[in-house]
Amino acid sequence: MCSRRRFNRSVFRSLILITLDKYFIFYCCSWLLIRYTRKLHFPIPLLNNWLTDFVFVPLIAHVAFVLGSLIFTTGGTFKYPIYQILSISLLTALVFEGFLPYYTHYNTADFYDVLAYFAGGVFYYAVHQNHTSKKIRKAFERKLSLSK
């Protein structure tokens, strides 16, 4: 008999295993590296300007993709269409490059940041989403073979 505790533990374990992949770890580590070098007043020139913007959209899309795959679909067959990922990029650009520069001193309106948001979205669509979808599908197939 399956207890609630065992079910919650298996869902949590699955969420961690699917979420933490090489791309997600790269996004988080690069963001931490850029924030750390900014804090030390020793920014890395090219990376400081656009890497955090590049990884922001894939980071958000990946977390939403994993949660959506675990909650709403079975087998990892779901994938975001390109227009949804570009919509995420557009909304991110509007908020961080359109509205927030008028209300905060930290944000600046920069066209290259907008390009970085869209490049990150295209990267997620072309590379990372396929990687994660295959990973979820394999885990689902493994689970089906174990239950037989």
What are the residue ranges of the model-derived segments?
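Bulky hydrophobic segments
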Residues: 7-148
